[in-house]
Amino acid sequence: MGGSRNYVSTSHRAEAKLTSGRRLQGGRRLCNAMRSPAFPPRRPSHLVRYIFPAFLLIGIFYYLSHRPRDPAVPNAYLTSGHDSKLPSSSSNSHKQGTPDVVNQPAKNPASNQKPVYGNTDGANQPIDPKPASDQPAQPAQPVQPAQPVQPVAPKPTVVHPIDELIKTADKDYKDLLAKESNTLAEAAQAYRKRRGRHPPPGFDKWYEFAKQNNALIVEDFFDQIYHDLNPFWGLDAATIRTEAMGYEMVINVRNGNASAESDWFWTQIWLDMIQTIEHLLPDMDIALNAMDEPRLVVPWEDISAYMKKEKQSRILSPTKSIVKEFQKLPPPAKHDENDKSLHTIDKNWEDTNPYWLIARRGCPPDSPARKQPAMSSFNDKPNFSASWATPHQYQGYVSNASLSSEFCHQPDLQGLEGIFIKPLTTSATKVLFPMFGGSKLATNNEILLPAPMYWNEEERFTGGDDHGPAWSSKIGPVIWRGVATGGRNNESNWKGFQRHRFVSMNNATKLARAEEGVEPPTNFELPGSTYNLAAQKDKRLGSWVSQWSDVGFTDLFCDPDVEPKEEDGQCVYTDEHYETVLGQKLAVQFYYKYLPDIDGNSFSGRYLGFLRSTSLPIKSTLWREWHDSRLVAWKHFVPMDNRFGDYYGIMEYFLGYEDSVPGHDDVAERIAMDGKAWAEKVLRKEDMQIYVLRLLLEYARIADDRRESMGWVDDLVS
């Protein structure tokens, strides 16, 4: 949508070298001149006069040849050949015209630094100059003082890239806290600065509600709202109202009362949440997506046109002309199939598979996702192309978690994620209309609410009241349990599904056989040289992983059409690769230190429970959620690339390896505790209420015919 980002491109600097031959030739020419008949040596003083420059030149050459040279910087991870520009996904390129400061390091270190623990100083040994064989013997001269030899610089201490990322995250977090608004006037000023328009009517009531609930108010926390709503400034307000009212699953708000006809359990949970703030809401209709999968993918070209209109609408209207009240709406429509009074746009719902063909139309035309060919078969081993990850990585580790979840610059993900290969259900449209949902991909156009399981606080997603013991009392390093979801896996496509890939990477037997060359990996890759893993050098990767990993499927979620059908969670086409294990309640999992979180059919509903626990979440995801702008990667959680190529490197950093690589257990504990404390401060149910109230005030303004004149300006006139 709109702008583009730059790819990190590969460049090599030529190291300038002094050539001894050229300088020696100069010395020979000088000496030959001194021997010629035109310059006979009449007196010793004359001889000294000409010999001294020769010794001076030789001394300079000797000095220069012994200087330490800059270390060469190997390019261990980046590859060239991609476009120099990084196209952004349609849903992120118009993000309020402001950068996402939460997940980006303030100054990302260049991605072409030396690999971890590698011998990369690259300095050549000094070369002693030797006189040429035809150099004439010179008369004896007084001994000249020796030229000082510069000492070779000591090899710098290797800093692990994760240390750099954590340092950057700490700074980003402090910068974020510095933006806190402590008064209503400060909050309104921050709003105008970041959004380019006046706050919506009711902003003062929103602020009062937030302060009553002890909320930390930082304008950046609400970026996702404007990311979601801004394209709708390109639609007529009347169209927005009609499309919302005419949808089949709707929450209606009239005269401060919220209601819904649907008894679908997600609808009822969202209704319960909205009813807690209904007295502060204007009239509106809220259309809901009841599916796991998102449904709106408006072409990038259309979104760009809508965003152009949105940008033109950003004005700070004179205070005297501001409309301070929302309009009243007629009673909600009754959803009768025979009622044709509501003329809504035909959505032309699509069921195209693979879903990649739908999802990528939200990417810019020049993006790799649009330009690279689409896959037609998923039967072979997945293709892992680490070079596509370089825009969001630093030395192989995620440096921009927001960009990592975008896929427009990562065309290989079409064969590495179940949602792109074969979702459980596909029903998508190109038509932009106001549909609310709990999560979405980077190119989807839903308006995000906190997911139902976050509000409902069901124990299987939260772990209950027990958030785990103290770090020092935990019983094991890594645990993951889950069902083999991600989409509809079958005999010809399961190898690319993300959960299948991750579980295989934790199979010590598979790893050992792959290391020995006995059995090539079926659906994963051994780690590349970027990570310089000590266990891999020792050919003990499988043995090492077996010491700390407790990972397995509880159900293989087999294709329902396959024959013969198996019981107990087994599956005929994956049984030779996986054995099911007993499930563990989240409260039990919190007794482990590290909790990988892998996407299922959509986002992982356990993530908020993980953040609130005393354990450390290791998060890999393609899905956007309401809270993304509130979390700082490497400060509150550990981000992981969706290929999982950095997984072993992450674990080596935290756990160490025997005596050769030190661990960072204290760093892991600090991130876990910081994440827990932060979640308890900004991801509470009260914070969900505050977020939704702000969201719905903005939504009501966009659906009002007088929207460009509406706002809250009391701070400017008082």
Predicted segments, located by residue:
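Catalytic binding pocket for nucleotide-activated donors in carbohydrate/polymer assembly enzymes
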Residues: 583-716
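Acidic, Ser/Thr-rich intrinsically disordered and amphipathic helical segments
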Residues: 56-59, 183-190, 202, 497, ...
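Eukaryotic basic, amphipathic alpha-helical target segments in cytosolic regions
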Residues: 65-68, 195, 199, 211-214, ...
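Secretory-pathway glycan-assembly enzymes, especially type II membrane glycosyltransferases
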Residues: 45-55, 63, 115-118, 122, ...
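N-terminal signal-anchor transmembrane helix specifying type II single-pass membrane topology
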Residues: 2-89, 95
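Short interface patches used for recognition in eukaryotic signaling and trafficking proteins
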Residues: 41-42, 169-174, 185-189, 484-488, ...
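Asparagine/serine/threonine-enriched low-complexity, disordered tracts
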Residues: 85, 95-98, 103, 108, ...
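Compositionally biased, intrinsically disordered low-complexity segments enriched
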Residues: 130-152
